[in-house]
Amino acid sequence: MNPEERVVTWLISLGVLESPKKTICDPEEFLKSSLKNGVVLCKLISRLLPGSVEKYCQEPQTEADCIDNINDFLKGCATLQVEVFEPDDLYSGANFSKVLNTLLAVNKATEDQLSERPCGRSSSLSATTSSQTNPQAAVPSTTPEQQSEEKAAEMTENGSHQLIVKARFNFKQTNEDELSVCKGDIIYVTRVEEGGWWEGTLNGRTGWFPSNYVREIKPSERPLSPKAVKGFDTAPLTKNYYTVVLQNILDTEKEYAKELQSLLVTYLRPLQSNNNLSTVEFTCLLGNFEEVCTFQQTLCQALEECSKSPENQHKVGGCLLNLMPHFKSMYLAYCANHPSAVNVLTQHSDDLERFMENQGASSPGILILTTSLSKPFMRLEKYVTLLQELERHMEDTHPDHQDILKAIIAFKSLMGQCQDLRKRKQLELQILSEPIQAWEGDDIKTLGNVIFMSQVVMQHGACEEKEERYFLLFSSVLIMLSASPRMSGFMYQGKVPIAGMVVTRLDEIEGNDCTFEITGSTVERIVVHCNNNQDFQEWMEQLNRLTKGPASCSSLSKTSSSSCSTHSSFSSTGQPRGPLEPPQIIKPWSLSCLRPAPPLRPSAALGYKERMSYILKESSKSPKTMKKFLHKRKTERKTSEEEYVIRKSTAALEEDAQILKVIEAYCTSASFQQGTRKDSVPQVLLPEEEKLIIEETRSNGQTIIEEKSLVDTVYALKDEVKELKQENKKMKQCLEEELKSRKDLEKLVRKLLKQTDESIRAESSSKTSILQ
């Protein structure tokens, strides 16, 4: 590592120089531009020697300001007895090597001072160095348990001794506490457990991943860690500033809790007794502000108790993690209500401003109330910054270090959830308060409260085109809206009733992440793609809760009293229900199972006797008449039909007529017996056993007769109706386009006629003037 890179790493590790977002191609030029104004140097000397620089220009605008900052740094370096450079050497960049030599000397001088104190990390580094120089001292073999313990021990050390692994395969999380990784990702392991699962951090997120999906990175392959560079150890400085940062957290937390309590006592509670707002409006304005105040006071007390223990036993991160469920419930509820509170502030701004100023607030009083109600959001953002600063000044071996990292991640996640929830509730309020274009039916406010709302991408029916929609879920209906072309409002696109809705997850199919479909008897198939997994899980939970609610209980009974008793007995039992099963329909016993196949057409059964008598009468005249009245049978009986056609003798037809008479008598007797039991046993229609003859004409003009069940026929008719609807929709679109084109053409013709008329008039007037 060259001197420039060493200095850059050192400054970043001390926190006085911001880490560049991109890879540094030329460290020397980067240093020149970063150190030129002297601000970084003043921060450095203040960090190394607190109190050496009392005041410096943090935003220098002129050359004189920059030179003054550099001189302040050089004065501080005089106490370290190192060779210094001239201010112009740095500002002009002409002799930058002297600047590097001074910085390296400062690093060496502070290292010598720090080396006089014991440091666990330095001893671990020296032990590692000695083991590398003497490989014979290494243990030749270890058991898997010992290796796991060694890896866990490595993670308690600092710098390059932290276990770092590289993903060999892609892994997709299936639970909330797991970590999704891609091949080649670098993961910092935070916990090693037996059983094949390790805990690690990737891109600021901590979770579990399978250990056989990764491989350990060799020391030569590991990325450079600023804390791991020998000679840049700042443990005593870290220890000194840890207490300062912790005290800052306590002070700001007390001040924040005090401000909330002051707002509640001085303004909000007196406002409740005032007549400026109704009870509903005041409830919207206040929300759960009182609960937030109480919770923040509890948090202050808990943090103070943590700070009273010895420094190596501080559990600030653990305390915050224990209270994180309360954080989420309090702040998410506050965020959900905040857009309604802002709406109340907007509607009654004049009255509230007068009230605030009468209570002693400075003008404009409404601004004090608005900013005070927004402080919980600003404080939530500060938690992340404060904890990051605390972690920066905390030793990696501190028992609270891992909890601090987890708390940072938890607060980042909570902050993102709160921001999304505020935007969603604000959009929801906008939809409910503004008119919706092409809305059908009663006002949307009559549907009740919105259970959930989000922006999705949907596919309707068999169409592959994806459309952006806003879904609003109410207790009885799902509303679909779209943004207007100019993004000035919302347009109504349809609704789906909850009754009869069937929701199916599609996320298990590859390529359909965060996807589900909606089907039903009254709606065409809708495929919905959610923007993230959180929205997807929320939609699944809410829709399943509404569609799979308590089922109604009914049973066939002869009297209404038995039906009522059955219903009451069902509702009184609180036992858990099993899986839904189709109703058990008791089929009545009948002689119809011994009958031959019923008539293939319903119309044939109506005039059966008349037709049979007519057939018998005409059969003696011509065999063609018999063939005319007999319907075509099933395909597998084609041979018998051909044989029947061949038989043309009158004797054979008479024999068949006698057989038909026997069948008729049998059916008549069976129907009579069945009729005697009609009052006692209900008749049940079984669609799958009903048959129909369907005549279809193909494109080549050939007519085909097919036998279909009633169910198949209904579904075929449903498909035909669907096709007709689509064709009708296309025809409407074509008609609208044609009407629009005709109107445009009419406008164009009128315009041309008008221009022609004007030109003719102009010519005639010019001719008249010439003649005169």
From Swiss-Prot:
Compositional bias (Low complexity): 122-133, 557-573
Top-level taxon of the source organism: Eukaryota
Domain Calponin-homology (CH), residue spans: 1-111
Domain PH as annotated: residue spans: 443-548
Sorted UniProt keywords: Cell projection, Guanine-nucleotide releasing factor, Phosphoprotein, SH3 domain
Sites bearing Phosphothreonine, chain numbering: 133
Region (Disordered): 115-158, 557-581
Described purpose of this protein according to its UniProt entry: Acts as a RAC1 guanine nucleotide exchange factor (GEF).
Gene that encodes the chain: Arhgef6
Chain intervals with Polar residues compositional bias: 134-146
GO BP of this protein: intracellular signal transduction; lamellipodium assembly
Quaternary structure annotation from Swiss-Prot or TrEMBL: Interacts with PAK kinases through the SH3 domain. Interacts with GIT1. Interacts with PARVB. Component of cytoplasmic complexes, which also contain PXN, GIT1 and PAK1. Interacts with BIN2. Identified in a complex with BIN2 and GIT2. Interacts with PARVG; the guanine nucleotide exchange factor activity of ARHGEF6 is essential for PARVG-induced enhancement of cell spreading.
Modified residues (Phosphoserine): 126, 225, 488, 640, 680
Gene3D superfamilies, A to Z: Calponin-like domain (1.10.418.10), Dbl homology (DH) domain (1.20.900.10), L1 transposable element, trimerization domain (1.20.5.390), Pleckstrin-homology domain (PH domain)/Phosphotyrosine-binding domain (PTB) (2.30.29.30), SH3 Domains (2.30.30.40)
Protein name: Rho guanine nucleotide exchange factor 6
Organism from which the protein derives: Rattus norvegicus
GO cellular component terms listed in the entry, alphabetical order: cell-cell junction; cytoplasm; lamellipodium
Location(s), subcellular: Cell projection, Lamellipodium
Domain spans labelled DH: 241-421
PROSITE patterns xref list: CH, DH_1, DH_2, PH_DOMAIN, SH3
GO molecular function, one term: guanyl-nucleotide exchange factor activity
Pfam families reported in the protein's UniProt record: betaPIX_CC, CH, PH, RhoGEF, RhoGEF67_u1, RhoGEF67_u2, SH3_2
InterPro entries: AlphaPIX_SH3, CH_dom, CH_dom_sf, DBL_dom_sf, DH_dom, GDS_CDC24_CS, GEF6/7_CC, PH-like_dom_sf
Domain SH3: 160-219
